[in-house]
C-alpha cells in the first residue's frame, strides 16, 4: 500500500486498487461542564464540528461515506450524536453514522474505528 500526504489540504490518500480518502477531523473546544455549552444539545455541538470540517476541506456532503463521532458522555435526548449531527449539518440520510462513547479517548477510538472501516 502506498500513502501520500497532502499537507496543504491535510488529507491522507491511501492508494491501492481503489482510492480511499481519510479526511482531516475536527473537534469542539474543551470547556468545563455546566458552562458555555450548558444550553446546547450534543448534536448541535457535533453539527458545528461537521460543518466546520466540510467548510475547511471544501468537501461536498454528498461525497461523505460515513460519519464517526466520539463523545465523552451520552445524552438520552440525543442517543446517536453522529447521526443527528450529520443530518443537521446537511449530510445525506443515506450515510452510515456511528457514535463512540469512551470517556476521554472517544476521539482516538473514533479515528481507530474509521481506519478499521477503511482497511476492511
Model-predicted regions and their roles:
Residues 7-95:
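Conserved "HGTGT" condensation-loop signature of ketosynthase/thiolase-family condensing enzymes
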Residues 101-120:
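Active-site-proximal alpha-helical scaffold in enzymes
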Amino acid at each position: 500500500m502506498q500513502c501520500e500526504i497532502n499537507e496543504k489540504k491535510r488529507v491522507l490518500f491511501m492508494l491501492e486498487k481503489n482510492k480511499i480518502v481519510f479526511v482531516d477531523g475536527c473537534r469542539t473546544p474543551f470547556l468545563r461542564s455546566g458552562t458555555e455549552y450548558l444550553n446546547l444539545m450534543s448534536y448541535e455541538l457535533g453539527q458545528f464540528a461537521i460543518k466546520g470540517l466540510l467548510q475547511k476541506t471544501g468537501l461536498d456532503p454528498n461525497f461523505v461515506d460515513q460519519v464517526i463521532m466520539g463523545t465523552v458522555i451520552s445524552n438520552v435526548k440525543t442517543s446517536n450524536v453522529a447521526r443527528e449531527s450529520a443530518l443537521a449539518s446537511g449530510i445525506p440520510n443515506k450515510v452510515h453514522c456511528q457514535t463512540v462513547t469512551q470517556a476521554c479517548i472517544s476521539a482516538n477510538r473514533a479515528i481507530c474505528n474509521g481506519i478499521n472501516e477503511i482497511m476492511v
